[in-house]
C-alpha cells in the first residue's frame, strides 16, 4: 500500500510533511486538467498546506488534513484515457456495491452535485460515497475527488459536472486497487 503522507511523530513533536511527487508531467492530464490548473493546484496550493504545516503556521490540523487529502488525490491520477474503466479489485468492488460502473458514476455525480459549497467527495471502503465539507483526515478513502473551486474553476468555470465526468478518464485504477 502507498505511504501517502510521510511524517515522523516523536512524542508531541511533528517533524515534517512531504509533498508527494507526481508520477506524470504537469501537462500530462490535458485536456482533462490543464497544466495551469496543475501548476496552481499541486504546485502552489498543495505545497502551501505542506509548508504551512512544517513551519507551524496557521491551523495545523487544517493544514495537515489539506496536505493529506491532496496526497491521496494526486497519485490516483494518470494520463487521460477515453475508455478508462475500473479493473481488477476496484471493478469487483464497484460491481458489488453499485452493480455497474455507470451506476457508480451516476451515484457519485448525484452525491457530488448535492454537496452545497466546497469540499471533497470520496468512495469509502464500506462502499458508500461520502463527502468532506472541510479538510479532515479520513482512513476509509478509496477514491477521492477534490470538489473545491481551485480544482475545477480554472478549466471548467461553472461546469462542475463536466469536471467530474471528465475525471473518470484520468483515474488510475491500479492505485484504487491498491487502496482496497
Where are these regions (language model features)?
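Feature for soluble, non-membrane regions of globular proteins
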Residues: 2-180
